[in-house]
Amino acid sequence: MNCVEVRELVHRYGGDTVLGGIELQVPQGSIYGFLGPNGAGKTTTLRLLLGLLKKQQGSITLFGQSLDAHRIDILRKVGALIESPSVYDHLTAVENLELLRRVHRCPPRRIQEVLSLVDLADTKGKSARQFSLGMRQRLGIAIALLHSPELLILDEPTNGLDPNGIIEMRELLKRLNREHGITILISSHLLAEIERLVTDVGVISHGVMRFQGPMSELKRRQPRGLTLSLRTNDDGKALRVLAEQGLGARADEGRLVLPRSSDGEVAAVNRCLVSQGLEVYELSAGGNDLEANFMELIEVRP
């Protein structure tokens, strides 16, 4: 079952089409990475999911209900942090949460529960003005968690964080998903961070979804543009042998470089050269498959 279903979502600012009919499915219980370069349409999509922008075309369904028809009921089950958290700098974490607790009509004990979840229980009398960026982001998540949502929507929550802050944020989100069953939809342009965190991924570029599915499927997908690099005792002969096999190798700074389509091709090239009496001194597959996949997907224009 999908927690979020988006169909043929189109959005325009003036004459510019920001979203060109995207489809988005977030499985319930997943950590879904919404991945794409800056300006791809990620924040616009999340704002539409939260009803912060008026939908122009398409359908949005959350928890099996239409956002158009059940907006208030749906948003009671959703927590969100879009861009930077909105907090009162002169108030403490507890005081910021107390204001919103009254709005949500949560029991008083919920404040300490969410502060413990995000590791801010010991901030005591410190005002939000004194918080580090990482602490402010965690306070923003505490605010989003206050009313015990089933879905957490986060827009670039690791932006500006130092390496330690990024690790803390990653572990927090994993814990919320694992121990509390919260479905998490997180946007980012940081491929390496998304790879370590999510179960499912959608790649958006120029307002169009380029890929959607389990992260494991994206990793298995064979991109174009991967290379095989090698050195032999006779590169001239190696070039001729490879050409006879239909492999277009080229000389590049003392090495031979040729395209590859699979890991099996690496072994085949090695066997071919050795069978012709060549000595292969070095053989390496170039390119990060996941990185190459991502770059290939986002560079395609509609």
Enumerate the predicted regions with their spans.
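ABC transporter nucleotide-binding domain
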Residues: R170-R260
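C-terminal coupling/interaction segments
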Residues: S261-P302
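Active-site-adjacent beta-strand anchor residues
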Residues: H90, R231, P259, L283-S284
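ABC transporter nucleotide-binding domains
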Residues: C3-V6, H11-I186, L191-S205, F211
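Short, surface-exposed acidic/glycine-rich loop or hinge patches that mediate macromolecular interfaces
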Residues: Q65-D68, R105, M209, N233, ...
